[in-house]
């Protein structure tokens, strides 16, 4: 008799995705981040659900309800900080996952890659609307500044901003709808994740060499289930350490002050995971130009498969491309640092140079060096 997991309609899907899935035998720990992102998503949905049971999306009570969760609800402080720091872990895993894709040429699976970019945008939107909910100073002013960017769109900009606000400023209507968005988006993300996996399993996983590994596959379980469990334990350990020892390390102290439309904080800045994009936005002295650069800094990922000029898929055997890749990582870290600094000399010029380098590396230098590497292969 055939095993039920191979015949039952539902079990069969799970079996083909997580148990008997043929997987390359040589994928490294950089391939762990996919499952870690799944774990982060489940964790965020669960902690978020319990927070939503006690949170009130109203301007007069939102801040107090978060304080109530932290003070009066059993382990409320723990759930709240798990959720806040869980978002940081989510983005660390996301950026590592994207970096892996760039390094090893996983973007050549175009459908999987494009769904991935869409997922990145959706997660960023979710994090943004979520940050507004505690209704602290940085929540309010962050929402005001970022939604205001849409007013740079010619002709319809102002109307669009007021439509999103539900009034003439960020107010009760804005908070209520942002809570609604923050609740629905993770479920949209879950659906997109299923599509992401569907497309991935059409082609099978890439591997560090970038060479097809169809002749050397092993079952996902037990080899990679055990490897993923190790990754998950390390992720949980990091998250718990952050949550229990320094829960506010990555947060902004300004968000412990209730939102006040009459008092602007000295330095308005987003959470650390948006700082690189914020630095690119600020580096252009024109509003529309800044907004376009901000959008392009993320959407440029869509064009990466078209910019592939190398004859090799992976960067594993391409030392010059590796050098440029790590330069790009250093540049992104520089932009992240600049995004958190005030707009004054020398940060302005450093931010502008780092922004130029970011686009130059992706659009010009990396495709060019790949062509040179192709020539070197012929020697």
Swiss-Prot record:
Assembly and binders: The cytochrome bc1 complex contains 11 subunits: 3 respiratory subunits (MT-CYB, CYC1 and UQCRFS1), 2 core proteins (UQCRC1 and UQCRC2) and 6 low-molecular weight proteins (UQCRH/QCR6, UQCRB/QCR7, UQCRQ/QCR8, UQCR10/QCR9, UQCR11/QCR10 and a cleavage product of UQCRFS1). This cytochrome bc1 complex then forms a dimer.
Membrane topology: Multi-pass membrane protein
Cofactor: heme b
Protein's cellular compartments: Mitochondrion inner membrane
UniProt keywords, alphabetically: Electron transport, Heme, Iron, Membrane, Metal-binding, Mitochondrion, Mitochondrion inner membrane, Respiratory chain, Transmembrane, Transmembrane helix, Transport, Ubiquinone
Protein name per Swiss-Prot or TrEMBL: Cytochrome b
SUPFAM superfamilies: a domain/subunit of cytochrome bc1 complex (Ubiquinol-cytochrome c reductase), Transmembrane di-heme cytochromes
Any single GO BP term: mitochondrial electron transport, ubiquinol to cytochrome c
Annotated heme b b566 binding sites: 97, 196
Protein family: Belongs to the cytochrome b family.
Cofactor note: Binds 2 heme b groups non-covalently.
Binding site for a ubiquinone: 201
Main subcellular location: mitochondrion
InterPro entries given in the database record: Cyt_b/b6_C (IPR005798), Cyt_b/b6_C_sf (IPR036150), Cyt_b/b6_N (IPR005797), Cytb/b6-like_sf (IPR027387), Cytochrome_b (IPR030689), Cytochrome_b_C_euk/bac (IPR048260), Cytochrome_b_N_euk/bac (IPR048259), Di-haem_cyt_TM (IPR016174)
Amino acids binding heme b b562: 83, 182
Organism lineage: Eukaryota, Metazoa, Chordata, Craniata, Vertebrata
Domain of life: Eukaryota
Organism: Grampus griseus (Risso's dolphin)
Cleaved signal peptide residues: none
Role this protein plays: Component of the ubiquinol-cytochrome c reductase complex (complex III or cytochrome b-c1 complex) that is part of the mitochondrial respiratory chain. The b-c1 complex mediates electron transfer from ubiquinol to cytochrome c. Contributes to the generation of a proton gradient across the mitochondrial membrane that is then used for ATP synthesis.
Assigned GO CC terms: mitochondrial inner membrane; respiratory chain complex III
